[in-house]
Amino acid sequence: MQLNEPAPTPTLARSLGEPAHVSGWAIRLAKVIGAGDRFAEWLLKAAVERGATHYRRDFDPSLPPDNPAISDEEIGVALCLGHQPYHLDNVRAAAQLLSSPRVDAARLCRLAVRERCEPVLLHIAAVAERIAPALEPWAYLRQHLPPRPVPRADALPHWTRLVSHTAVTAQGG
């Protein structure tokens, strides 16, 4: 007998070699929004609408609208949760959204610890240090977020996938 079930989508935590922490906070947030099992898709849509424009695409119009009661910090952290599907665009969109001057670095730091996504945010902060060392909230996170190593940090985006490359064109300029 052969089972032809699709393979489950790997999670971000599994790709990092960690057990996935299933966030009760994120489950409640998905219910409040009305996104259900499409929470990750809604998060990306909300991040794009709030400024992560590099990841603009056509989203399903049946997704719930953005909810201004949910902060940029919450959307960014939720995109980096270990139980989310392993889609690096989520991490990249979180990096762009959280680079906004609207972000409260101390609040972001508290959320990151509570939701166990310190390795992802510290990876982004390390990339920011190479390009713009004083850029907030990343400078704050490097100083205040406790490090938590993961077995496979190579699963996170290469630094070149987290920065804008100016003066680079398809014609090689």
Question: What do these predicted regions represent?
Answer:
Residues 75-173:
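Hydrophobic alpha-helical interaction segments
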Residues 20, 27, 37-39, 54, ...:
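Polar low-complexity intrinsically disordered regions enriched in Ser/Thr and small residues
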Residues 5, 9, 22, 32-37, ...:
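Intrinsic-disorder-associated interaction segments
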Residues 29-98:
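Helix-turn-helix/homeodomain-like alpha-helical modules used for DNA recognition
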Residues 1-28:
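Basic, Lys/Arg-rich alpha-helical nucleic-acid-recognition elements, primarily the DNA-binding modules
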